Amino acid sequence: MQDTTLHIRHLGQQDYESVWHAMQHYTDTRNSDSPDELWIVEHPPVFTQGQAGKSEHILNPGDIPVIQVDRGGQVTYHGPGQLVVYPLLDIKRSKIGVRQLVTHIEQSIIDMLAKYDINAYAKADAPGVYVDQRKVASLGLRIRKGCSFHGLALNVDMDLAPFRRINPCGYAGLEMVQCKELGGPQTVIEAGDQLIITLSQLLGYQQLVHHQGLAAS
């Protein structure tokens, strides 16, 4: 039976690797009674290369570090002004399939942007969310022991130039776009507050409990 309470952890700006390892630890040590959590964070500039990633898609990283990680997908960029959301969910307990989870995440972004009269959409062959063929949100998950970690990155108000140093998600010439220039949420906090609402509704959570920072380990 699904626990209808979702714990939201607001992490502020945090180093990518420390949050990644904390996600792994939470997933590896959780049990059937562990709560589902949503981690809201921004990262300093970093490229992350997913398990399907190919080195030729990293064109010119320059001074931005490249980290090989254990999520699905290919290379992407994280940086200040981008909303990153990590759903740490027991999908086995809640009886949500992986494809259904991906669809819910994409739809939550689409629904949130629709509140700003932005017509966004998903693509069956290229996970993420798009507006006029430009990508506004990237998606990469990992499922372990029936539980999800990693998640989504929504471009809000950031420097998009580093995306030109890679082939985003393995697509040469893929153009990125962000919420601010589309007339969407203007800050990461605003985007996070709105996305929490749409995502929790789609996933069936009825009570949200907010926390600042990670739980003491």
From Swiss-Prot:
Pfam families: LplA-B_cat (PF21948)
Annotated active site: C169
Catalytic activity: octanoyl-[ACP] + L-lysyl-[protein] = N(6)-octanoyl-L-lysyl-[protein] + holo-[ACP] + H(+)
GO CC term (a single one): cytoplasm
EC number: 2.3.1.181
GO BP term (any one): protein modification process
Principal subcellular localisation of the protein: cytoplasm
Annotated GO MF terms: lipoyl(octanoyl) transferase activity
Record's keyword annotation contains Lipid biosynthesis: no
Chain residues that bind substrate: R71, G72, G73, Q74, V75, T76, Y77, H78, S138, L139, G140, G151, L152, A153
Involved pathway(s): Protein modification; protein lipoylation via endogenous pathway; protein N(6)-(lipoyl)lysine from octanoyl-[acyl-carrier-protein]: step 1/2
Described function: Catalyzes the transfer of endogenously produced octanoic acid from octanoyl-acyl-carrier-protein onto the lipoyl domains of lipoate-dependent enzymes. Lipoyl-ACP can also act as a substrate although octanoyl-ACP is likely to be the physiological substrate.
HAMAP family according to UniProt: LipB (MF_00013)
Entry similarity comment: Belongs to the LipB family.
Name the record gives this protein: Octanoyltransferase
Originating organism: Shewanella sp. (strain ANA-3)
